[in-house]
């Protein structure tokens, strides 16, 4: 096995790690065999030089192998972002996940508490009454009954406890900010994945291809959002059939108006939960529009829609029919041990 000091020495020279070296390094880190100082040096060495697709793939592979697994249908999708975009919007991926499920696509959503906003996916779902403290069998049953299940990252990646103190002490983005969205415990092969910078859309798509995904959109909004934005264009790297295509989309492609970033600013978990409820009740406005856009993308990834315009229409129908509101009610019931779903 590669010695961890040797790996750190290679990083200190500015060298990229090959797949075997990177895998060995993450095995050492995630098994608790590295000291806190070594982990800090490792993370900083990667960050200063710039993380490679091979290193990201290796880290995500090790995290997936060590995760507490969940069973999900083969056509399930994850709708997830790296977080840390600093924009502080409403919970867009959370609301999108509910609408996608209501449109008939099973969702195995992986997420955590807030990164840079006031409210992360876990915070908002908890405020909506979803029980996060459930076992893999209950999550699988939730996906079956409600069409959606939520996997709380910290409950599924126990090995992260070895790096948590160092990450907190460093206070900067590290490779682990990238690995979470790539480490879905249900091993889904379809993703709508938002990243914190445009230069990462293609590398993330390449990593997803390496990890076995068959269909994905990796996106970044021109306003900095780790979502498709309605304030302007968004960069997209599409993975389909083993090929990656990079292009740009606008809200107009989905027949939607542009919004200002102020219209999309979120609040604390309770405020964001209330906004989701209003959205599911059919409230019009900028929040609904951005959820329609992101749902449309997820429906393209899932093969349910051919275009953003078609997908946005299906998303609107899922909300206006009451199906999305019912999906939330089913999710709350399924995670709280109630059978009336």
From Swiss-Prot:
Q: Which residues participate in Mg(2+) 2 binding?
A: 226-227
* GO function term, MF aspect, one: anthranilate phosphoribosyltransferase activity
Q: Which InterPro entries match?
A: Anthranilate_Pribosyl_Tfrase (IPR005940), Glycosyl_Trfase_fam3 (IPR000312), Glycosyl_Trfase_fam3_N_dom (IPR017459), Glycosyl_Trfase_fam3_N_dom_sf (IPR036320), Nuc_phospho_transferase (IPR035902)
Q: Which Gene3D superfamilies match?
A: Nucleoside phosphorylase/phosphoribosyltransferase catalytic domain, Transferase, Pyrimidine Nucleoside Phosphorylase, Chain C
User: Which of this chain's residues are annotated to bind anthranilate 1?
Assistant: 81, 112
Q: Which residues bind anthranilate 2?
A: 167
**Pathway entry:** Amino-acid biosynthesis; L-tryptophan biosynthesis; L-tryptophan from chorismate: step 2/5
- Residues at which Mg(2+) 1 binds: 93, 227
Cofactor(s) the protein needs:
Mg(2+)
Could you say which EC number(s) this protein's record lists?
A: 2.4.2.18
Q: Which family does it belong to?
A: Belongs to the anthranilate phosphoribosyltransferase family.
Entry protein name: Anthranilate phosphoribosyltransferase
Give me the gene this protein comes from.
trpD
